[in-house]
C-alpha cells in the first residue's frame, strides 16, 4: 500500500504514541484534583504547556486545548463574532478556508453578520490590495489560512498581520494546520492560530488554539474546570503531552524532512510535465509537500479510484470538500472549468520512499496510456 495523502492525515509517530500510552498509564489522575496524583498530573500539564508555548514562541496562558481543528475553528468564528458584535458584524474569509470556518461563518449570517470572501491574485495568494479595499470600520475578523490545503500555496500572513494592526477591533486568525513542520512559523502578527496535530504525526481528536492575551472569546463549551476560561472540560493530559512531542519532532526535524520531500517533489513534477494532457496546478509559491495537477478531460474521481485499485492512496481534493465540487483555487489560477473539476492532489512525507514514487509513476503511466487509448 502506497500512501500519498499526508495532507489529509498523517500516521502517529511512534515516539508520540509512546508518550500518549505511557501518560495514560502513569498520569491518569485529574490535574484539577488536590491529592498527590492530581498534583503530579498538574505538574506534567504545566511543564508540557510551557514547552509548547516556547516551541511556538507564545505565552503559556495563550494556549487553549481543544478536540481538533474543527472545534477550534468553530470557536474562533462564533466566539469572536459573539464577543465583538457590538463593534461590527463584518467578517472576511479568504477563498481558501476550510469548511470548519466557512460553515459556522455562513450560519452567522442568520444572526445578521455579513461574510465576504477575499479574492486571490494570479498566483493563488490572497490579494492584499483587494483586502485593503474590503476592510471596513465594522470588520471584526479576518481569517486567512497559512498554507492552503489544495495547492499548498503559502499565504502572506505576516504582511496581512501588519496591515490589520491599523484596525483596533479587527481580529486576525490563521489556520496553520498545513504549516507546522513544513515552513518556518512566526505568529507575532496574528491574534488567533489553529493547530491540528494529526497533520504533523500527532493524535487525531486533539487540537490547539493560540489566543493572544488581548483577544476575548465567548466560549462554545461551558462547565467544568480547565486550563482556560474559554474552553471547559478536564484537560486530556496524555493528548497534551503527545502534542508537545509531535511539535518537538516536527520543528526540530523540519529542515531534514523538507530536503527529503523536495527530492520526491522534483521527481514527480518533472515526470508529469512530460504528459501533454497533464497540467501542474501547484506553483513556485507552493510547499514541496503538496502537488496538485489536472488530467484534462478526466474525471478526478475515476483517477483516484484507479489508483486505489492499484493500492495507491491520494485525493481528488481536500477530504472535507464535496467530491463533485470544482476547485476554487485551481479555477482562480487557470480560469479553466475543466482543470478545476479534474484536479487531484498528491501530498508527500519524509516517510515516502523513492520506490513508492517510482511505483506511483509507473501506475500513472498505465492509467494515462489506457486513457489515451479510450479504455477509461
Question: Over which residues does each language-model region extend?
Answer:
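Pyridoxal 5′-phosphate
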Residues: 1-376
